[in-house]
Design a protein with these regions (language model features):
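Substrate-binding/catalytic lobe of Class I Rossmann-like enzymes that use SAM or dcSAM, i.e.
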Residues: 192, 197-224
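Conserved nucleotide-cofactor-binding alpha/beta core module
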Residues: 70-205
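Class I SAM-dependent transferase core
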Residues: 1-78, 86-94, 108-120, 211-221
Length: 224
């Protein structure tokens, strides 16, 4: 695990937010990645498969996205693309006592996230860590077609799958307009390209990272 954490630090040392990076590294050390994947080498700083043609991002990329979100204690966060649940658990640790809602369109992955979270709780003796995960919720929902969450608002929104086309990017911009609180941040990658960042300050401000990434595509509809 230490080698993974050193790699995460090296990739993100120039982020300009050393305090948050320190908290992210602590969260990654406490929320054991091996409990969220069946992969043989869970501590490699690589994306790894979790089944159903899905992957979870490499830890360095996870940290970079969370740094760009500028997570703060008390933030209410929406994640689209629950994956294995590891990213959401880290977010929950960082924003406690804020709520974290993590969505996935595939029920099997949602059920797996819930099991992984319970497995983590059973394998730690730190009541403080467990308390920081109590307001984390995994739901099956397609954010584009099922608008059950559209009456809520969030301080931060993170997509963990990539924008495949302009039509989808327009929908993501609409989500930023409708669901972000003032001063909120939304981050979403392309399938291949930079990370897109929307900041809501009376109007939406769009930015892109210089770095390029590769993600599985963001899809619509639900599956079992």
């Amino acid at each position: 695990m230490q080698e993974m954490l050193r790699s995460v630090y090296a990739f993100n040392a120039d982020s300009g937010n050393r305090k948050l990076l320190k908290h992210i590294l602590r969260a990654m050390s406490l929320i054991d990645r091996k409990l969220f994947t069946y992969f043989q080498n869970p501590y490699e700083d690589n994306a790894i498969p979790i089944g159903r043609n899905q992957t979870i991002s490499q830890p360095s990329t996870v940290a970079r996205m969370l740094l760009l979100l500028d997570l703060k204690e008390g933030d209410n966060v929406l994640e689209i693309g629950a994956g294995s649940g590891w990213n959401a658990a880290i977010i929950s640790f960082l924003v406690y006592p804020g709520d974290v809602i993590s969505l996935d369109r595939i029920r099997e992955l949602v059920d797996s996230c819930k099991k992984n979270l319970e497995n983590l709780k059973q394998n730690v003796e730190d009541d403080g860590l467990i308390a920081r995960l109590e307001d984390l919720y995994f739901l099956q929902e397609d954010i584009f077609t099922e608008r059950g969450l559209w009456e809520k608002s969030f301080d931060k929104i993170i997509f963990t799958a990539g924008i495949p086309d302009k039509k989808t990017e327009k929908k993501i911009k609409d989500i930023a307009k409708e669901l972000l609180n003032e001063n909120g941040i939304l981050i979403c990658p392309y399938v291949s390209g930079p990370l897109v960042i929307y900041r809501k300050k009376k109007k939406l401000i769009r930015e892109e990272t210089k770095e390029q990434y590769v993600f599985v595509p963001l899809l619509e509809g639900t599956e079992e």
